[in-house]
């Protein structure tokens, strides 16, 4: 009897450390409370599908150099009604943010959507879901499945040598009206990728389903956007440029991408009455399908509340190439719309373009009053 009791006690004693060590692995996070410890002490972090509480960030801004973070399961976010709140923040050097098979990052957009996006003062909501700031050193964000973000999805700022690839951004749940939006789509201002004040950023092979710009570069240099699939939004955009702390765009390539069921295909927009520079931008091998407003749109009369119809020339737009932009727009749309300020556009090149279907006559005031065919 005594021997059996001692034997059982010994087996339990020796079993405890192994189980305890598994439960206490600081690098495998199963609830929000373990996140800070993992970020400070680990270089290979696994986030195992937990809810981020109200008012708390999924803070990955202090990752060690060369860290890898892998999302598993379903990561969700409790409601935080605050325009200045960023649910996810990422920063680091030579870091990798990725997702395991079957994972989902759900931004809880349904709790916020009201058809107004960032234009509502009474119904506050996080303006950017994921902020990638000062991320450098050949860092990578890959293979993430993100859905239902409240307003803008990615804000990429102050970063360099960064590649984002293989992402699926899916906000189609916001296409239909809800009780707050009346007849409007519930989701609004839901840009996929906003890029500012960054250098050598590459977006490749990403799918975006949303209700605003698929990609919007408002400032930055040496940006490459390739093999994108953009559906439901406002297309591949430069701008709006002007009136911000950084108003220089120089060296952007949009390559081999599809824009479908969207308001615009290729768009360059500068803010009315503002100053800045847009230089050396190429749209090449862009396929358009069922564009509802403009196949190609260059306008210098932009305001968030709507264009003024009177272009200004404070933002200089130069060395712009449209090469093999092809496809169809809706019968209610215009194939081309170019509205430049007095003397502020120069060096546009058009080659191999074929945009058809627009029932409204194209309108261009540069380089001549005749639009490209």
Curated annotation (Swiss-Prot):
Catalysed conversion reaction: (1,4-alpha-D-galacturonosyl)n+m + H2O = (1,4-alpha-D-galacturonosyl)n + (1,4-alpha-D-galacturonosyl)m
First-tier enzyme category under EC: hydrolase
EC annotation from Swiss-Prot or TrEMBL: 3.2.1.15
Covalent S-S links between cysteines: 27-42, 214-230, 340-345, 364-371
Catalytic residue positions: 212, 234
Source superkingdom: Eukaryota
Subcellular location: Secreted
Keyword entries, A-Z: Cell wall biogenesis/degradation, Disulfide bond, Glycoprotein, Glycosidase, Hydrolase, Repeat, Secreted, Signal, Zymogen
PbH1 repeat windows: 136-158, 159-197, 198-219, 220-240, 249-270, 278-300, 312-333, 345-369
Signal sequence residues: 1-24
Chief location: secreted
Effect upon mutating residue 191 to A: Loss of activity. No effect on Km for substrate
GO molecular function: polygalacturonase activity
GO BP term, example: cell wall organization
InterPro entries found in the cross-reference section: Glyco_hydro_28, Glycosyl_hydrlase_28, PbH1, Pectin_lyas_fold, Pectin_lyase_fold/virulence
Cellular component terms per the entry's GO annotation: extracellular region
Gene3D superfamilies per UniProt: Single-stranded right-handed beta-helix, Pectin lyase-like
Sugar attachment sites: 65, 94, 280, 290
Function description: Involved in maceration and soft-rotting of plant tissue. Hydrolyzes the 1,4-alpha glycosidic bonds of de-esterified pectate in the smooth region of the plant cell wall.
Family the UniProt entry places it in: Belongs to the glycosyl hydrolase 28 family.
Name of the protein in question: Polygalacturonase
Organism the protein comes from: Fusarium fujikuroi
